[in-house]
Amino acid sequence: MLKPTKNFILNLKKQKRENKSLLFLDNVKIIKDALANKTIKPECILTSLDSLPFEFEGEVYKVESSIIEQLSDTKTPQKVLCIACLSQYVVEQPKTNFLVLDSLQDPGNIGTLIRTAKACGFEYVFMLDCVRKQNSKLIRSSVGAVFDSKVYEMSRQEFIDFVNKHNLSLVCCDMNGKNIFELKFDKKIGVVIGNEGQGVSEEIARLCYKTVKIPMKSGIESLNAGVSGSIIMYQINKDLF
């Protein structure tokens, strides 16, 4: 293992503040999965352990636990910290059902939805003007699924052009829509989940060929975005289970 200089650590702290495209991963399972899927490009790993609990051929620095705590976003980080950037890939036409997140801002909701999408066979996720997928809370709440799915970040206009180019079918959730439990879907579709406070934007809603709703007892205005999106995805893919 290498011994870092004081300037090396200071530079990492500066990059943490200024370079929002960098990832600081402090969960061993998430690091292992991301490395295995080749969805990140690791720059180095810091650890307070005598040896890493997984194979890694890059630079490894032995540091005090306090250094990892200073660079981590969690209160009780594990003893391994991977500094990396996301691998770049070309946006491809979905081959399965897919999820569309329209300007969601809660990283916990986004992480939950990405994880659920993976479980439901929705292999593609389109994030339109959302919190960045490098967000540490998003990564933790997805339990690393953000590195195991095709997650694309783009603007609304870019997505609109993409939908029109590939003639994709979308559905969105609306209180005036049809009961999701009474519908069957016989083609590949994208499920649109809107902003926590404003719902689906007008531009994206116009692309949807159908609106659906989750029936609820009176007195409940709406469900959390993560909950409603999960229910809809499971219902659409129920025949797969």
Question: What are the roles of these predicted feature ranges?
Answer:
Residues 1-49, 130-131:
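Boundary-proximal intrinsically disordered activation/regulatory segments immediately upstream
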Residues 55-66, 96, 187-190, 209:
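Active-site regions of enzymes building and remodeling cell-envelope glycoconjugates
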Residues 172-220:
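Active-site/ligand-binding-proximal alpha/beta "capping" segment
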Residues 92-176:
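RNA substrate-binding interface of SAM-dependent RNA methyltransferases
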Residues 1-4, 25, 61-64, 149-157:
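Short acidic-hydrophobic, aromatic-tinged amphipathic segments that line or gate anion-handling sites
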